[in-house]
A protein has these predicted regions:
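The feature marks the mature, well-folded catalytic cores of soluble enzymes
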Residues: 1-144
C-alpha cells in the first residue's frame, strides 16, 4: 500500500466507494498472482507516477513486489496521479534521476515502466485499434 494514498486523500475516497458498493482493491503482495486476476477484472487502475516526462506525457512507474505493473496495464481505464515534483523535461532527465538514485545506493525498482497514453496498434492496412496491449482510456491528474 502506497503511503501517498492517504497523503492525497485516496484512502478516504476508496472507503466512500466501498460504502457505495464498489469493489476496491489495494495491491497486496501477500496475494501474489491473485492481484493480477483482480487487475484483469478491474474497470479502473490507479497509480502514482514516480517520474513524469513533460515532453511526451509519459508516466514512469517503479514496479516491484509491492507495486505491480498490471495495475496500469490490465484494467480498461488507467488513471495516473502525477505529483508536480515528479515532472522532468524528457527521457534523458528521467534516466538521470534513476541513475543518481542508484549511485546514492537508494533502492530502484526491479522493473521500470514508461507509459504514454492508451495502447495503440495498427495493422498493415492502417486500421488503428486502441487498447490492444493495455487500457483503452488513460487519464492524468496532476497534484501539488
Amino acid at each position: 500500500n502506497d503511503e501517498r494514498n492517504d497523503e492525497y486523500g485516496r484512502g478516504e475516497f476508496y472507503k466512500s466507494l466501498e460504502a457505495e458498493g464498489t469493489d476496491v482493491h489495494i495491491w497486496d503482495p501477500a496475494l501474489g498472482k491473485e492481484n493480477q486476476v483482480i487487475a484483469e477484472r478491474a474497470d479502473v487502475g490507479i497509480t502514482f507516477s514516480e517520474i513524469t516526462l513533460a515532453e511526451s506525457g509519459t508516466v514512469t512507474l517503479f514496479n516491484n513486489k509491492g507495486n505491480g505493473r498490471t495495475i496500469s496495464l490490465l484494467p480498461k481505464t488507467y488513471i495516473a496521479i502525477i505529483p508536480k515534483s515528479t515532472l522532468v523535461a524528457r527521457l534523458s532527465q528521467a534516466t538521470k534521476v534513476i541513475h543518481e538514485a542508484n549511485e546514492k545506493g537508494q533502492p530502484v525498482a526491479s522493473c521500470v515502466s514508461f507509459v504514454t497514453g492508451p495502447s495503440n496498434s495498427a495493422d498493415i492496412e492502417m486500421n488503428l485499434i486502441v487498447g490492444v496491449h493495455g487500457p483503452i482510456k488513460a487519464t492524468y491528474i496532476v497534484v501539488d
